[in-house]
Amino acid sequence: MALQRTQAFLLLLLLTLLGLGLVQPSYGQDRMYQRFLRQHVDPDETGGNDSYCNLMMQRRKMTSHQCKRFNTFIHEDLWNIRSICSTTNIQCKNGQMNCHEGVVRVTDCRETGSSRAPNCRYRAKASTRRVVIACEGNPEVPVHFDK
């Protein structure tokens, strides 16, 4: 419980620093960074089962109008995720060269195919695997989960 509070505090602190302009991606990059955080970052280690996916997909607003078919939650602290942006650039799926890869703990949530929004249902798969994220800005921050 104390670890969760600490991680939540650190995330809140970072968001506050962003708001104060002390860590300053551009406005467009900031919006994309905030979206990345909302859709993909959950430092809790409680992921891994179907109930987790059902709850988190709804909480993070990915089931309002239609069921998002697939989403990955990264279970690492924000600094570990941001450090991926300092690794060697690799090519993204769209051909751009602003992607980076790292190995992290994740929960992949895949929609079952038989549910309808807003009552979407997901199957979970927890693993430690290689991920590819796109980063932008100065300093670079993650803005897109590529694979």
UniProtKB/Swiss-Prot annotation:
One record GO biological process:
defense response to Gram-positive bacterium
The main place the protein resides is secreted
Query: What are the protein's GO molecular function terms?
Result: endonuclease activity; nucleic acid binding; RNA nuclease activity
Please tell me whether the keyword Thylakoid is annotated for this protein.
no
**Could you say which residues form the signal peptide?**
1-28
EC number, as in UniProt: 3.1.27.-
Q: Where in the cell is it found?
A: Secreted
- Locate the residues binding dUMP: 35, 40, 68, 71-72, 145
- Active site positions, chain numbering: 40 (proton acceptor), 144 (proton donor)
Gene Ontology CC: extracellular space
Using the record's annotations, give every residue carrying the modification Pyrrolidone carboxylic acid.
Answer: 29
Q: Which keywords are on file for this protein?
A: Antibiotic, Antimicrobial, Disulfide bond, Endonuclease, Hydrolase, Nuclease, Pyrrolidone carboxylic acid, Secreted, Signal
Q: Which cysteines are joined by disulfide bonds?
A: 53-109, 67-120, 85-135, 92-99
Question: Which InterPro entries would you find in this protein's record?
Answer: RNaseA, RNaseA-like_dom_sf, RNaseA_AS, RNaseA_domain
Record function comment: Cleaves preferentially after uridine bases. Has antimicrobial activity against uropathogenic E.coli (UPEC). Probably contributes to urinary tract sterility.
Family statement: Belongs to the pancreatic ribonuclease family.
Designated name of the protein? Ribonuclease 4
